A protein has these predicted regions:
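Histidine-acidic metal/acid-base catalytic patches
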Residues: 2-15, 19-25, 29-40, 45-85, ...
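An N-terminal assembly and electron-transfer interface module characteristic of large anaerobic redox
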Residues: 11-15, 19, 91-98, 170, ...
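Asp-box/BNR beta-propeller blade signature and adjacent active/binding-site loops
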Residues: 37, 42-50, 89-96, 105-106, ...
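Short, acidic/polar
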Residues: 51-53, 90-104, 162-169, 325-331
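Catalytic domains of carbohydrate-active enzymes, especially glycoside hydrolases
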Residues: 96-115, 175
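Structural motif corresponding to the early beta-alpha repeats
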Residues: 115-256, 268, 318, 381-382
């Protein structure tokens, strides 16, 4: 077939070629990926569609200290397909755990975090966990520790619980796990969560929080209320009998006692602790004040025992929920080497501490690129978790529903990871 090019077409083609400049690759650096000297994107071991099991990141709804802040409970997750639909010929049948790992790896994610087993942790069991993930091509970089409510509340038996925490941390150090994350709640304010819908994105789900929320009959909520409480605003809910009410002074006293025993042992073990903020950062939660619901509280925490082992989980979403600029807050803690883990998400705030919406990572008030640049600037090299995916029909139709109202599943995590990687690559190149 003959092709006719007019003189004008030839001139236009030549001009476009000149504007295009050198061919791709001539002097243009390739984007950088996660490495030893960069932040590392991670997911929880249960984030890829299967059940969480013992290796997930979820926590029981309701009682304070047993919950894993920042990571949704398992929700309703589908079983793995054996072999995965559309997989290459010869792909073997997979266990649910193998299928999860395969999906995580397909997003280019090589690091995972998980909830830990019952304390005290055993070196052999931890090594098995790490070796299992390694066999999937994944590195376990963070475990959530819990099971020390007496230490949190200052009750009898706290010394025995702290002994078990210390034993667990030494086991972690022996297997080379770098970070242990934990919470310090008198009560986690999950009763204030509800689902909102993004009208612009045609019904995608957000997670709303309202300090004055009254539960509406017939709607699903993360926490169940008694009949007597069902007409009360969240802020007026009474303390639970097994938790009691606690002041800031009481909570600071219990965590100070904990840190002065635990941090020296963490230093010996070569392990960093990361305390997650109180999320939601409500001023009072069922009668108890919250020590990690303010930036001032975060700053006080790292001064109790001055050590890189005594750090925080920097959550830019919670930072904004409290009305602060996460870029400035990241700079404060990163410059002091006190960020031991990062949660990366976005929100819109109507009233700091009391009324906000957890939205898609690309549409909130946070400048996520500026946050990432600040982390890179201060040479943060540990994990970044793009948590709290939003609800999408694709996940809803497949039963992949996050444990938070308005939370999503694997498809939404793919969006979170892709956006986070774009921010990271741009920050590394800037």
């Amino acid at each position: 077939m003959s092709v006719y090019l007019s003189r004008r077409t030839m001139i236009q083609t030549a001009g476009l070629a000149a504007l295009a400049g050198p061919m791709s690759g001539a002097g243009t650096p390739e984007p950088r990926f996660e490495g030893k000297d960069t932040p590392k994107i991670c997911l929880a071991t249960g984030d890829a569609g299967g059940g969480f099991g013992s290796g997930g990141r979820g926590g029981a709804p309701g009682g304070a200290a047993a919950q894993s802040a920042g990571a949704a409970p398992a929700g309703n997750q589908p079983p793995a397909q054996n072999p995965p639909a559309g997989a290459a010929p010869g792909t073997p049948a997979l266990s649910p755990q193998e299928a999860n790992a395969r999906r995580i790896k397909q997003l280019g994610v090589n690091y995972v975090l998980s909830g830990g087993p019952r304390i005290p942790w055993d070196e052999t069991a931890l090594k098995t966990m790490m070796d299992t993930q390694k066999s999937y091509g994944l590195t376990l970089g963070n475990l959530m520790i819990q099971g020390f409510n007496n230490a949190i509340y200052g009750h009898q038996g706290r010394d025995e619980e702290i002994d078990r925490v210390i034993q667990s941390i030494h086991a972690v150090g022996k297997v080379g796990l770098p970070v242990v994350e934990y919470n310090w709640y008198a009560h986690r304010a999950t009763e204030g969560y509800f689902e909102e819908f993004d009208d612009v994105r045609t019904g995608a789900g957000w997670t709303g929080f309202d300090y004055e929320l009254v539960h509406t009959p017939g709607r699903a909520y993360m926490a169940r209320l008694s009949d007597a409480e069902s007409t009360m605003k969240f802020k007026d809910l009474p303390p639970l009998a097994n938790e009691g009410a606690h002041t800031l002074d009481e909570m600071w006293a219990t965590i100070t006692y904990f840190l002065k025993r635990v941090i020296p042992e963490a230093e010996k073990a070569g392990v960093r602790l990361a305390l997650h903020p109180n999320d939601p950062p409500a001023p009072v939660s069922r009668g108890s004040q919250q020590i990690m619901s303010s930036v001032e509280g975060w700053k006080h925490l790292i001064e109790i025992v001055r050590s890189p082992a005594n750090g925080i989980t920097f959550d830019c979403g919670v930072t904004r929920e409290m009305g602060h600029n996460p870029v400035e807050v990241a700079a404060y803690f990163a410059s002091r080497d006190r960020i031991n883990h990062v949660h990366f998400r976005n929100v819109r705030v109507k009233k700091p501490y009391e009324r906000y919406s957890e939205v898609f990572i690309d549409e909130g008030e946070n400048n996520m690129f500026a946050v990432m640049k600040e982390l890179v600037k201060h040479k943060y090299t540990r994990l970044i978790y793009p948590e709290h995916p939003r609800a999408l029909d694709y996940d809803r139709e497949r039963g992949r529903i996050g444990g938070y109202p308005g939370g999503g599943g694997y498809a939404s995590f793919a969006f979170q990871v892709g956006y986070t990687r774009a921010m990271l690559q741009a920050a590394l190149a800037s």
